Amino acid sequence: MNTYKKYLEEIRHRKKKGLKPKPIDNGKLLTHIINQITDQKNIHRKDSIDFFIYNVSPGTTSAAFVKANFLKEIILKKYIIKEIPTTFAFELLSHMKGGPSVKVLIDLAIGENLKNAQKAENVLKSQVFLYESDMERLKTAYHNGNKIAKNILQSYAKAEFFTKLPEIKEKIEVVTFIAGIGDISTDFLSPGSDAHSRSDRELHGKCIFEHDINKQNELLKLQKKHPDKIVMLVAEKGTMGVGSSRMSGVNNVALWIGREDSPYIPFVNIAPIVGGTNGISPIFLTTVDVTGGIGIDLKNWVKKKDAKGDPVLDANGDPILEEVFSVKTGKVLTIDTKKKILYDGNRKLSDISESFTPQKKEFMRAGGTYAVVFGKKLQSFASKVLNVDAPRVFSPPKQIYNAGQGLTAVEKIFNKNAIIEKKEK
């Protein structure tokens, strides 16, 4: 049985479980699929085109290398695929998240075909996930007098990959969904017993809420009722995301309530919105930032106090809580990202300034922390190559400083990386 037939068998098996075809990361399988695409009479050609466009894992998988190189051959007219014209081939490359796609784009940008070079230039200006080897290729081309490379580096020095992105929405309408009462652990969102399925995002997504199908269906029903709003997952009277720092917890939340990162990348969602009466666990909040999401300290319950200002205790000696405002499932609220306030209609509920610091808003705008980290490095690199000062685009990081006290080696490294150094005068 060839690799494609095995894949079809796997698809049939997954369909019985209510799963879609697994994203392709095997280069050998994708090569077989490409052969079927180039064969105009192949009975599997239509499905093969759909698999190629919509169901290949991005990044540095062997399939991503095969996909990027085939797109390059389409652009160079070695193959004429009517369903994938040149413009669309460039668009697909732009969604592949670095690695082999960037290598192909640089090949085209510094190549001899000016039309292709200009198209590759426009795509590269929007990319941030470049390896050092990619940056060195642009540097070498620039020093050799390549104008396209110069244009790309000038764009990077201005951080246009960030400044040309749309600002985050000023007002975001959310509908609440209480995932649980009390602290919610990452194990509730991504059980450790299901660790074996984490690489299969769709399959792993089915374990959210510890496989509670009724709760999952309630969430789906809520989304269907409010298609124009974003679901905010809430830990009522508790903290969201306590326990281990597993990224799969946030990935599962994003898969269920986040937005699609790309129409050409299957089962990768970003920007989930989560809230907790007592806020978000710091480690979990970091992983929310990685996805460009929003974490909100709701403060919707407070300790009841007596006339002296002391907490009122129940029969068990625990503080009695009073509800400040309701976030019961189905409650529609508005997040004002400019005023940094949570509203119920016109009623101000809570100050959420901590959720919208300048740095956090950058993560949201860029689609996650990695894009900002890579972007800063790219801007610094380009400005040094061009021997120009990098304009202040990103919020300045805070340097570590302790009066009368030395710095640890880690603190010194942090401070050095926190600054975009200006050229020497």
Predicted features along the sequence, with ranges:
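Short, 15-30-residue, compositionally biased linear elements
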Residues: 1-10, 99, 349-355
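Amphipathic alpha-helical packing elements
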Residues: 2-39, 360-364, 369-373
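N-terminal alpha-helical segment
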Residues: 7, 29, 85-86, 101-102, ...
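Structural detector for internal amphipathic alpha-helices that build alpha-solenoid repeat scaffolds
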Residues: 19-22, 46-61, 76, 83-97, ...
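Amphipathic alpha-helical scaffolding segments comprising HEAT/armadillo-like alpha-solenoid repeats
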Residues: 27-34, 58-77, 98-110, 129-141
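Alpha-solenoid helical repeat architecture
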Residues: 37-41, 74-81, 93-94, 108-113, ...
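Fe-S-dependent hydro-lyases/dehydratases of central metabolism
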Residues: 95, 107-110, 114-425
